[in-house]
UniProtKB/Swiss-Prot annotation:
Gene: rplU
Similarity comment: family membership: Belongs to the bacterial ribosomal protein bL21 family.
UniProt keyword annotations, A-Z: Ribonucleoprotein, Ribosomal protein, RNA-binding, rRNA-binding
A biological-process GO annotation: translation
An example molecular function term from Gene Ontology annotations: rRNA binding
Oligomer status and interactors: Part of the 50S ribosomal subunit. Contacts protein L20.
GO CC term (a single one): ribonucleoprotein complex
Function: This protein binds to 23S rRNA in the presence of protein L20.
Organism superkingdom: Bacteria
PANTHER family in the cross-refs: 50S RIBOSOMAL PROTEIN L21, LARGE RIBOSOMAL SUBUNIT PROTEIN BL21M
Record protein name field: Large ribosomal subunit protein bL21
Amino acid sequence: MYAVIKHGGKQYKVSVGDVLELDRIEGAEPKSSIELNEVLLVKGDDTKIGAPTVEGAKVVAEVINNARGKKVIIFKKRRRKDSRKKRGFRRDFTRVVIKEIVA
């Protein structure tokens, strides 16, 4: 059984036991449980497709930790103009493990 969920403007295909890195969820403590209610599709014995979401479906996940991703360097240069910009970016994310899919 798997489900397609929407979180943070992205879609994820998840099954029970999958580990995901979602955009930072404020107030999510490690070992706490969260519910993801924007379920777009559930596939098991039968398929349920939402319009836009499946009514009554949810995905239960357990928070593993909150962390920051690797640094990404953004470097812009205009040739012959002595113009340079260097910026760094680190993504904040919440790592979760999928515990249950309720259809």
